[in-house]
Amino acid sequence: MLRTRLSVSVAARSQLTRSLTASRTAPLRRWPIQQSRLYSSNTRSHKATTTRENTFQKPYSDEEVTKTPVGSRARKIFEAPHPHATRLTVEGAIECPLESFQLLNSPLFNKGSAFTQEEREAFNLEALLPPQVNTLDEQLERSYKQLCYLKTPLAKNDFMTSLRVQNKVLYFALIRRHIKELVPIIYTPTEGDAIAAYSHRFRKPEGVFLDITEPDSIECRLATYGGDKDVDYIVVSDSEGILGIGDQGIGGVRIAISKLALMTLCGGIHPGRVLPVCLDVGTNNKKLARDELYMGNKFSRIRGKQYDDFLEKFIKAVKKVYPSAVLHFEDFGVKNARRLLEKYRYELPSFNDDIQGTGAVVMASLIAALKHTNRDLKDTRVLIYGAGSAGLGIADQIVNHMVTHGVDKEEARKKIFLMDRRGLILQSYEANSTPAQHVYAKSDAEWAGINTRSLHDVVENVKPTCLVGCSTQAGAFTQDVVEEMHKHNPRPIIFPLSNPTRLHEAVPADLMKWTNNNALVATGSPFPPVDGYRISENNNCYSFPGIGLGAVLSRATTITDKMISAAVDQLAELSPLREGDSRPGLLPGLDTITNTSARLATAVILQALEEGTARIEQEQVPGGAPGETVKVPRDFDECLQWVKAQMWEPVYRPMIKVQHDPSVHTNQL
């Protein structure tokens, strides 16, 4: 069976089911199916052996034991190879080298009151837990009641953070059960407030902190987290452009943690195989720098050559320490986000969520709205109010998607209009605009005599099909602006996306009122329905988990524009809009987000295989015949099942006590 960088098990889903069904009377602890990779390092094998304590007798002979792809022991329970041996899996029992307090303090292994009586005996927990054994459902009921006692979103965010560092399974299971309620607590809009207060609310460190004053320590610091095959997905931030609230210094590590929580929740990446990284390059936030409790470097942000050299060392270290990991850039400032993506996207599989992820989900919403109103993308005119990383990412994604579907690039760019704090971006602004902005600049002659600083006047002349807000200018989409748009567009498509909620360019209730419920609206934060119309949230959690999962499973060498476009088309196809009825909203609900991510990942994988950027089929099938390589199904539905079989689920699994070689690196215990 195929060894996976995503999985922590070596038994296929159906194999495990058959095995446990055939042996229902056996104690769970007697099934030594390996979890693996949580404590492997480089090319050395994990030398796990089952203990011979009276509380846990070895239930099989050495002849029954075979080496798994990661060098651990697992019971050989099948005579013939399984027909789906190339499918990866995240099921099976867990081998655990910890016991007592160490086990209870490990968020990846801890079950709290759900440890079975046999596990309590085997792991020396009997004196440390109340006698009643709870189910996960009972723990979820208790945790949710505790959460409901809390009155503010930030207090609930603190509770969820505490739960995450105690028990990963319970944390993710609780979010999944109450996903619509809790995603806004662990992510936008509440996470922005938690990031701003990071140094005052700090309790326990998570992630890796890299200091620009110690660039030679980068590789060593990254390696403390695991071996070369221990990490699938890395989110890194220098914290300059956090969630619409700007420079937050060291607190930006929280956005990396939040994004990775969504990667696990939505994309099924195992929580023990992700890595949040904070690049501390100083801060220009004077309030933070004056704060005696601030935990990061208090000098001004370092830029120029020293910054670039630091990033170069970081990229080289990632390629060396975690050569197969996908790198996700998050909340870099506008001057760095795009250039770093363009510089490194072909050196390693990398992705910028603010540029590509935002663009992807907005593009999908736009396609869904156009399809619902029988309009063509090539005839669409889009006015983007806010020309930073997000606005440019949306513009580029629209252009790339048009090009992918046969429109000339220059013609596509003519359909995009960008406004920033100076107004509509014109060719005369070249000295004060970035190269990425200038490709969308309009002729000064064409706009002579028009007040290009007025959003109302620009809307009057552009007559946009779609108006997008990425400005963080609260209330910018005024009644006169929206009514002017509605004059020329019976079904205006309006996306106020700025976060947090207080910075939205308009609220959905006003947009629907000013257009007599004719607007097709999606926002950047959650809002309640308006007159029976569900307001979709253009949340990046609809895009980056699926794209990231697809890149991980395909072993992509790069994440191409066509791979992202494939994800966009798949997301647009999942729109719940019905002909003549716009009440269901533009995007699928959060309650189906796991399936949504799996379908996006499938589209990404198939596109990567078509383009030749996928390395998965170059990998040897562990335990297979010499030269036998992995084969990924080309049929969409079959590939979808292949993907789903590899997605981690927040469920408790039986635990096996083992000893391990102390010289072998122990990752994230």
From Swiss-Prot:
Cofactors required: Mg(2+); Mn(2+)
Disulfide bonds: none
GO molecular function terms noted in the UniProt entry: malate dehydrogenase (decarboxylating) (NAD+) activity; malic enzyme activity; metal ion binding; NAD binding; oxaloacetate decarboxylase activity
Binding site for a divalent metal cation: 330-331, 354
Sequence segments annotated as region (Disordered): 33-68
Pfam short name (any one): Malic_M
Protein name: NAD-dependent malic enzyme, mitochondrial
Originating organism: Saccharomyces cerevisiae (strain ATCC 204508 / S288c)
Source taxonomy: Eukaryota, Fungi, Dikarya, Ascomycota, Saccharomycotina
Gene from which the chain derives: MAE1
